[in-house]
Each structure stands twice: as C-alpha cells, then as structure tokens.
UniProtKB/Swiss-Prot annotation:
Its EC number is 2.4.2.8. It is found in: Cytoplasm. This is Hypoxanthine/guanine phosphoribosyltransferase. Pathway: Purine metabolism; IMP biosynthesis via salvage pathway; IMP from hypoxanthine: step 1/1. The gene is hpt.
Amino acid sequence: MLLEETLKSCPIVKRGEYHYFIHPISDGVPVVEPKLLREVATRIIKIGDFEGATKLVTAEAMGIPLVTTLSLYTDIPYVIMRKREYKLPGEIPVFQSTGYSKGQLYLNGIEKGDKVVIIDDVISTGGTMIAIIDALKRAGAEIKDIICVIERGEGKKIVEEKTGYKIKTLVKIDVVDGKVVIL
C-alpha cells in the first residue's frame, strides 16, 4: 500500500528528544500526491461508519485535505475546528494540548443532534482528539465514528480510556533508529 511505502521512506527530524516523521498526510510536504490522498480516503471509507452522518469534523490543518476529499466522495459536508476565534453565535472554544503545542480550538457549524464522523491525520498524544470530542459533546452532537490515518504512541489508548470512544486507524507506526517502522 502506498501509505505504508511512503511512511517507511519519509524523512525524520529531531527536535529536542522527539523524532518527528515528515509525511504528506501529516505535514503536506514535500508534496501530496493525488493517488496517496485517494488511497487514504478510500481506506477510510471502507472502515468508517458514515451511514446517516450529517457532518465530517476535523481540526486544522492537516485534516483539511482529508475531509475535503472524503466530503467529495461521500457528499457529507464538513466542519473544521479552527485555531482562531470567529465570535460567531454558538462558537465553542476548547483547550487543546498536544506533544508540541497548547492553545484553543474553536468549533462552529455543529448543531445539536448532528451525527458526526471525526477525521484526523495523526493521533499521538491524544490531546487534539480529546479537545474535539469535548467540543462536540458540548455542542450536543452524536459521534458516530472516529478515524485517524496514522497512529503513533499511546494517544489512541489514552483517548479511548478517557472518553469511552473507539478510534479506528489505518496504520500504526513508531520511529526507531531514525526510520519509520510499521507496527
């Protein structure tokens, strides 16, 4: 599969003690090939529960190409949790803490009773996903499914234990000796 092939060959950047993998799906660089995006979207559709979903939800930034592609395939509109406040009526702010940053995310466009599928590029610490789930619950949405393309670290387990929601992923990885390893 192209996703796994490109992960195995992607560059690794060390910041402090953490090794970041740089990949088109997680970073948008060096280039996002349509065939990779198509493969990822098709695989998400195969494992996801989109039946009756009224909205797809992601956080900016790298979930945006994923939900755009999925929206075109499924005809389900999408909502992006943004990093800046718009002060629209009903906007829900939520604190987000990840392995590399802390800040607010803002949810707009979700109505009570919406049936949503959450899509994200990577789950590693779980901080972004916990923030998304919290905001959606506060908005009164029903979470139908949660799908992340790449799983790294303990974030999936942390989110599942903390929220009770199961998270589906396409591939689980680690970085060992300066290379991505598929687990």
